[in-house]
């Protein structure tokens, strides 16, 4: 495991991609890129505001465009939760990086999202969180080379687990 690798974190909003990503990048001495922050800086709005002002499809297109346009250098990349809807982006990430799925139970996601009302979830108004969860989890599982369950585990311990799994891949 080295700072020369590219690691892409995927998972539902609230799964800890940003938190774990920062810690993992620090531990590896790698750069950290959060595509949600790139989008918010570009749009000068929170993800929730972007969805309110436009719609969920617009946010998904932004996520896709940011990841297709972004040069991929050795780093830890935290992706937006709906990035798995873009086969083009996921194929690019799978080819250029180790895709890691931070897997969280639905109750964990619901709780964490309730703590962050500014978090935007790219979905239609008719979809419940459970609907989106059931739709996305198989997509996350399909693209992941590594999966780590995040429920009831401290971020530092998740990073320890991740490093062990990533080291095993490079052997």
Regions found by a protein language model. Give the residues of each.
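P-loop (Walker A) phosphate-binding loop of NTP-binding proteins
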Residues: 12
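A glycine- and Lys/Arg-enriched "phosphate-lid" helix/loop adjacent to the NTP-binding pocket
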Residues: 95-138
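Conserved glycine(s) of the Walker
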Residues: 16
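Hydrophobic anchor at the beta1->P-loop junction of P-loop NTPases
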Residues: 9
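Walker A (P-loop) ATP-phosphate-binding motif of ABC ATPase nucleotide-binding domains
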Residues: 6
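ATP-dependent small-molecule kinase phosphotransfer cores
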Residues: 35-83, 87-94
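Short glycine-rich anion-binding loops that position phosphate/pyrophosphate groups of nucleotides
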Residues: 81-83, 105-107, 153
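NTP-dependent small-molecule kinase module
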Residues: 1-3, 19, 23, 27, ...
């Amino acid at each position: 495991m080295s700072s020369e690798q590219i690691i892409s974190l995927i998972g539902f909003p609230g799964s800890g991609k940003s938190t774990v990503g920062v810690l993992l990048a620090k531990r590896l001495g790698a750069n950290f890129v959060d595509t949600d922050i790139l989008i918010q800086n570009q749009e000068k709005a929170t993800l929730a505001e972007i969805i309110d002002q436009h719609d969920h499809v617009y946010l998904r297109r932004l996520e896709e465009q940011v990841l297709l346009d972004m040069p991929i250098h050795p780093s830890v990349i935290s992706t937006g939760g709906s990035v798995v809807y873009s086969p083009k982006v996921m194929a690019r990430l799978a080819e250029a990086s180790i895709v890691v799925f931070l897997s969280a139970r639905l109750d964990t996601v619901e709780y964490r999202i309730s703590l962050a009302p500014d978090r935007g979830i790219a979905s239609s108004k008719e979809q419940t969180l459970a609907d989106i969860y059931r739709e996305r989890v198989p997509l996350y599982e399909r693209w992941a080379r590594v999966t780590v369950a995040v429920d009831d585990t401290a971020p530092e311990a998740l990073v320890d687990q991740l490093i062990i799994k990533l080291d095993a891949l490079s052997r």
